[in-house]
Design a protein with these regions (language model features):
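Divalent metal-dependent phosphoesterase catalytic cores across multiple superfamilies
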Residues: 1-2, 43
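Active-site groove signature of glycoside hydrolases
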Residues: 2-36, 60, 146-148, 153
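Short, conserved catalytic or adaptor-binding loops enriched in Gly and charged residues
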Residues: 9, 74, 179-181
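A structural motif corresponding to the C-terminal end of an alpha-helix
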Residues: 9-15, 46-57, 138-146, 195-210
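Short, internal active-site loops enriched in acidic
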Residues: 24-26, 65-68, 155-158
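Extracellular glycoside hydrolase catalytic/binding regions
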Residues: 30-141
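Aromatic-rich peripheral "rim/lid" segments of glycoside hydrolase catalytic domains that contact
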Residues: 152-212
Length: 212
């Protein structure tokens, strides 16, 4: 219950947009005695508690993919459904799917592309920039349904696929443009030392031209 301390401590801070519980917990029933309903019950309890402590901010969760009817029906106190979506260049399909199930607010809590192409075994910043532009624009085009997006991610992480003192190749198969592989240490729009990649300037241009 340490979260209640954080809510009470920071609920009046102007930087608080909303409170969010969990990141892709729905992918891990093993954390909840192999029964994902235990997570949804806990999420609902936490969301209801936060709303009683702070009625001025919505409560969200970072859900892996589109939430099921089980998740939606179990958590009426969740105001905003975040979705981590990796569907090649089509995050908008997930927006349509959730909108068909609920009128609750939604946002894309993760989306993006990495800068390493496993097919060519080389870094390809241009591909990442192109994919990032398409993904972000498709989300923005659906702003009547989707309130925003958190791009994954700002900075490369060197700890995820091997030696943390060097940038390693490694990850897993997924619907990631343009090689269907998520290279875990190449997701940043800047390098570890904060050198901007091509995708950084794409993101900058999109956000500068978008009305918020």
């Amino acid at each position: 219950n340490s979260y209640t301390w954080y809510v009470n401590q920071f609920k009046d801070h102007p930087a608080i947009l909303m409170w969010e519980f969990g990141n892709e917990f729905n992918y891990h029933p093993e954390w909840f005695n192999n029964n994902i309903q235990n997570w949804y019950d806990q999420l609902e309890n936490c969301a209801a508690t936060v709303k009683s402590l702070d009625p001025d901010h919505p409560v969200s969760t970072g859900h892996g993919e589109v939430p099921s009817s089980q998740a939606l029906n179990s958590c009426p106190s969740v105001d905003v459904w975040g979705m981590n979506i990796y569907r090649w260049l089509s995050p908008d399909s997930a927006i349509d799917e959730l909108a068909a199930q609920t009128d609750k607010a939604m946002y894309i809590s993760e989306a993006g592309a990495d800068s390493f192409n496993s097919n060519s075994n080389s870094e390809n910043e241009a591909e990442q920039a192109q994919a990032t532009e398409i993904i972000l624009n498709k989300i923005i085009e659906n702003s009547d349904l989707c309130i925003g997006v958190t791009l994954f991610e700002f900075c490369d992480e060197w700890w995820k696929a091997g030696n943390p003192n060097q940038q390693d190749i490694g990850g897993f198969s997924n619907a990631i443009p343009y090689d269907s592989f998520a290279n875990e240490e190449y997701w940043g729009i800047v390098t570890r030392d904060r050198t901007p990649k091509q995708s950084y300037y794409v993101v900058q241009e999109i956000y500068e031209s978008t009305s918020l």
